[in-house]
């Protein structure tokens, strides 16, 4: 069985036991988190939401809160002696999908 959930403005296909990286969630490590925005549930019986599936939830355990790899953003204006170098690390949450309730 699999499901498509929405979190952080993205749609993610998940299965039970899968580890996923999502945009940072405001929960502590070791806690459980429940996704209510389930857009699709597939498997033996297919359920399509309009826009979400009624009563369907996906439960996950928080493994880690972290920050992604550093990227460097460099902007400049030609012939103006104007340059700016800036770094960014995107925060993320690592989850393990425990159960899909449909």
Swiss-Prot record:
GO cellular component, one term: cytoplasm
One example GO MF annotation: rRNA binding
A UniProt-annotated Pfam family: Ribosomal_L21p
GO biological process assignments: translation
Keyword vocabulary terms for this entry: Ribonucleoprotein, Ribosomal protein, RNA-binding, rRNA-binding
HAMAP family xref list: Ribosomal_bL21
PANTHER family in the record: 50S RIBOSOMAL PROTEIN L21, LARGE RIBOSOMAL SUBUNIT PROTEIN BL21M
Listed NCBIfam families: L21
Family: Belongs to the bacterial ribosomal protein bL21 family.
Oligomeric and partner information: Part of the 50S ribosomal subunit. Contacts protein L20.
Function: This protein binds to 23S rRNA in the presence of protein L20.
This protein's name: Large ribosomal subunit protein bL21
Gene source species: Staphylococcus aureus
Lineage: Bacteria, Bacillati, Bacillota, Bacilli, Bacillales
Gene name as annotated: rplU
